[in-house]
């Protein structure tokens, strides 16, 4: 189950042009977004560790997104 709140995901879908959004659709997108965010975060943590740091910096996130 996704930890991301459903309301912001609902707003994103509406911003994309939907007039109505089912709860199941918003939950499914929230789960997918959370999985993608965790994937990026894990890569960023690995990059920070590789650089000898404990702190994840914006550069780590940018590089993780590009890879």
From Swiss-Prot:
Role, per record? Binds and compact DNA (95 to 150 base pairs) to form nucleosome-like structures that contain positive DNA supercoils. Increases the resistance of DNA to thermal denaturation.
Against NCBIfam families, the record matches this protein to: archaea_histone
The entry's localization annotation reads: Cytoplasm; Chromosome
Q: Which UniProt keywords apply?
A: Chromosome, Cytoplasm, DNA-binding
What protein family is recorded?
Belongs to the archaeal histone HMF family.
Gene source species:
Pyrococcus horikoshii (strain ATCC 700860 / DSM 12428 / JCM 9974 / NBRC 100139 / OT-3)
Write the protein's name: Archaeal histone B
Q: Which SMART domains match?
A: TAF (SM00803)
